[in-house]
């Protein structure tokens, strides 16, 4: 009799433990970088809730209406001609397509769209104006009369030296630099002029 009660207690203990684990998984938010469910500094939950943002795939761009803004945030996939055609069609209908890239992953899409800029394959660092460490530099973005202080999460920079179009809206401090990845070596060499063009 006593052994059967022990089995019941063990089973109940396991069931309660599993219930607690599942509740913790359900209620603890995601901490993934750039996740729409992440409420921390490296997440997008405030952005998603404040601006009523919804997730879509590139194949759904033809369903998006005029007067919308699409953000491509932290891309991590290879792009092909199909993706570029969807983006090109969206842009031709008057859409705004904003690329927020880390490590220059979207260079392939930019090339397929025949835009004459290149993303540096490196990380913007700033030892002066930053959040917690130099890989999270502050960038001041000027839109109209408003200044936004953005903290880039392993951001990169744009090289527009081959084109005469475009303008810079975001600036890091004068002590910022690019850590360029060249094979397995990292270099802290200066690239380009004094202005950092930030995505």
Per-segment meaning from a language model:
Residues 1-199:
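Short, surface-exposed patches at the edges or C-terminal ends of soluble domains, predominantly
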């Amino acid at each position: 009799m006593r052994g059967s009660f022990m089995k019941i207690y063990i089973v109940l203990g396991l069931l309660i433990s599993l219930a607690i684990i599942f509740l913790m998984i359900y209620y603890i938010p995601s901490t993934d970088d750039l996740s729409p469910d992440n409420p921390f500094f490296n997440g997008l939950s405030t952005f998603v809730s404040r601006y009523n943002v919804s997730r879509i795939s590139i194949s759904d761009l033809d369903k998006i209406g005029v007067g919308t803004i699409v953000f491509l945030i932290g891309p991590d996939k290879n792009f092909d001609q199909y993706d570029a055609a969807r983006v090109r069609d969206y842009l031709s209908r008057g859409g705004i397509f904003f690329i927020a890239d880390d490590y220059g992953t979207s260079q392939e899409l930019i090339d397929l769209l025949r835009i004459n800029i290149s993303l540096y394959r490196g990380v913007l660092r700033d030892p002066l104006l930053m959040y917690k460490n130099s890989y999270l530099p502050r960038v001041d973005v000027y839109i109209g009369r408003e200044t936004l202080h953005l903290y880039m999460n392993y951001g990169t920079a744009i090289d527009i030296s081959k084109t005469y179009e475009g303008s810079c809206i975001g600036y890091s401090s004068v002590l910022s630099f690019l850590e360029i990845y060249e094979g397995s070596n990292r270099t802290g060499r200066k690239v380009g002029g004094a202005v950092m063009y930030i995505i």
